[in-house]
């Protein structure tokens, strides 16, 4: 499978893609460059597909890639419920995209970045 090097070493590239994938799962929208967005989209599509499968092997594969960060904090009665990015993927996003066969993300173009004129885009999850 071909991939973009993005001007980084393999470890740096993998860390950046993991971070962007996790950020998109948590926030459901990120602003980044066009080439990064096109590369991150591949990983997000795979993670949501794993979430739709929902078995133990899929959970372990997703847990190995998605960062362990807090996605949401809710207060119910006197309890504080903390939801991780992985829980959000399997509990919220997977049921939302259950009827959709791929194409979970959308790329919207923005104006160029002021400093270096890089093409900027908004990468978001489709409703």
Swiss-Prot record:
GO terms for biological process: translation. Coiled coil: none annotated. Gene3D superfamilies: Ribosomal protein L17. GO terms for molecular function: structural constituent of ribosome. Keywords: Ribonucleoprotein, Ribosomal protein. GO terms for cellular component: cytosolic large ribosomal subunit. PANTHER family: LARGE RIBOSOMAL SUBUNIT PROTEIN BL17M, RIBOSOMAL PROTEIN L17. Belongs to the bacterial ribosomal protein bL17 family. Part of the 50S ribosomal subunit. Contacts protein L32. NCBIfam families: L17. This is Large ribosomal subunit protein bL17.
């Amino acid at each position: 499978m071909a991939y973009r090097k993005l001007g980084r070493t393999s470890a740096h590239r993998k860390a950046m893609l993991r971070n962007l994938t996790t950020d998109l799962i948590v926030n459901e929208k990120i602003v980044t460059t066009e080439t990064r967005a096109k590369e991150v989209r591949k990983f997000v599509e795979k993670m949501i597909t794993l979430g739709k499968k929902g078995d133990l092997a899929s959970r372990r594969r997703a847990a190995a890639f998605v960062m362990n960060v807090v996605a949401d904090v809710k207060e119910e009665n006197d309890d504080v419920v903390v939801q991780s990015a992985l829980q959000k993927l399997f509990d919220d996003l997977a049921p939302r995209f259950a009827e959709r066969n791929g194409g979970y993300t959308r790329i919207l173009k923005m104006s160029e970045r002021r400093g270096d004129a890089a093409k900027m885009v908004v990468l978001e999850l489709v409703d």
